Amino acid sequence: MEKTLWTWTLLAVFSLLVVKGMSDGLDLADALGDDDDDEPTTKPPKADPGAGGAGGAAVKPTLKPVKPTVKEPAKPKPKQTGLDDFDLADALNPDNDIKGKGKDSGKGDKEVGGGSRDDGTPNSRGSQFSDDDLLDVGNDNSYKPDKGKGGKGGSSSNVGDLDPADDNNYDTMAETGTIAGIVSAVAMALVGAVSSYISYQKKKLCFSIQQSLNADMVKADAPDAVVAQEPQVQQTLLQPPNAEPPTEENAV
């Protein structure tokens, strides 16, 4: 029984020692990896067997020049940028523009904002638009619009390209517009005169009807007085405005 106990005790001690020895070299950080422990991407150049040395083989003479083999250094990996490194100002940097391919790839990329014309004259910066840009466009004689298309206007440089028939058309259109304006003014005046005359006749007719009604009412109320006053009223109407009013002796 004692031997069995000693045996188990020795096994337990031995297992503890083994576990302790294994745990000394165990590190959880090894599972996460480290950039410093990565192997270098560039391999050391191999030794040239033709180089001079005790164990090197002899180089055979050749007529062709031997080009040295030089390996380009490995390009560093681009650093991954997060949202904290995002900056809108990078869009205004001309170095970040994507260049096109071909001989005309750099044409038009003048200053920030690009937009250079085909004549090679660079425009001003996109945020500094000035009057010089408009003057350059006005002095550009390379643009010639197609005949019969677009507007008829043009700068002084294109005056010789105009058709004489166009000037006649302009004069005809101007005369037509003037005549139309005069005719419309006369028509409006006639319409106003006719409407005024009609309104005057309506008022005159209304007054005459009112006077006749008043006279009929007076005759119906006092026929004797009306008969006595009618000659005086007729005489008053026949007299001029400067005449003296009739007296009682002259009244009939």
From Swiss-Prot:
The chain crosses the membrane at residues 178-198. It is a single-pass type I membrane protein. It comes from the Eukaryota. Keywords: Cell adhesion, Cell junction, Cell membrane, Membrane, Signal, Transmembrane, Transmembrane helix. Coiled coil: none annotated. InterPro entries: CD99L2. Its main location: membrane. GO terms for biological process: cell adhesion. Pfam families: CD99L2. It is found in: Cell membrane; Cell junction. Residues 96-120 have a biased composition (Basic and acidic residues). Residues 30-170 are annotated as: Disordered. One of its GO terms (cellular component) is plasma membrane. Residues 1-23 form the signal peptide. Residues 57-68 have a biased composition (Low complexity). Belongs to the CD99 family. May function as a homophilic adhesion molecule. This is CD99 antigen-like protein 2. It comes from Danio rerio.
